[in-house]
Amino acid sequence: YNLSTMWQSPNGTIRAILDGTVFRAPILVKGIEPYVKNWEKPITLARHAYGDVYKASEMTIPGAGKCELVFTAEDGTVTKELIHEFKGPGIVQGMHNLEASITNFAHCCFKYAIDTKQDVWFSSKDTISKKYDHTFKDIFQDIYDAEYKETFEKLGITYFYTLIDDAVARVVKSKGGFIWACKNYDGDVMSDMVATAFGSLAMMTSVLVSPDGNYEYEAAHGTVQRHY
């Protein structure tokens, strides 16, 4: 296409600007049956729309050397964290997220659950990612306890956190009918799995809801022609 550079994903760029949450849900029709026979109700994927690998910086390591994370505060204070002592060529990736964006993500999920009267599951890998993923977990729990727990209990719906691998096993055994909140990459992958398991990757809605009330409707995938 004679591009001047390898531009980033247009959808990813728009999502990063709007922030918010991408809600993806299978479209159920007679004649298209779920491959997972016990699924009776739609499973809605709530995908965080900002950060992680989609806003990452990457580097090819040419040879031996030391790679560090360096944070320079406004007052000039420098904090360093060793990533790896390379003995030869390799690769490295640095990604980030924002507490404000994670907070918006949590609010979107809980409000959508109240509107639709569905349970919320949130999953990540905090046993391995003690700071990154654990921050997501803590923010979700704090917001739920402070602002939504009472309303959830009145409506008879629940929120719980579990590890991403445990969530996958639970989802397959479930009857559906809940919101599965995931980080950006997890939501990207698992939404395609859920839609396909419901019968067709092509039969999936995708709506980005931003914190300030804007909506973006998009195709939920880029390779659907391979799946007809």
Predicted regions and their residues:
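N-terminal glycine-rich phosphate/adenylate-binding segment common to multiple enzyme folds
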Residues: 1-78, 185-189
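Short acidic, glycine/serine/threonine-rich loops at helix termini
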Residues: 2, 55-60, 131-136, 171-174, ...
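Solvent-exposed alpha-helices and their adjacent loops that cap or buttress functional pockets
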Residues: 6, 34-39, 84, 113-114, ...
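Generic secondary-structure signature for well-ordered alpha-helical cores
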Residues: 16-23, 48-50, 54, 107-118, ...
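Glycine-rich oxoanion-binding loops at beta->alpha junctions
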Residues: 22-24, 162-171, 225
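Glycine-rich phosphate/diphosphate-binding loop of Rossmann-like nucleotide-binding domains
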Residues: 71-75, 79-164
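Glycine-rich phosphate/nucleotide-binding loop
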Residues: 171-228
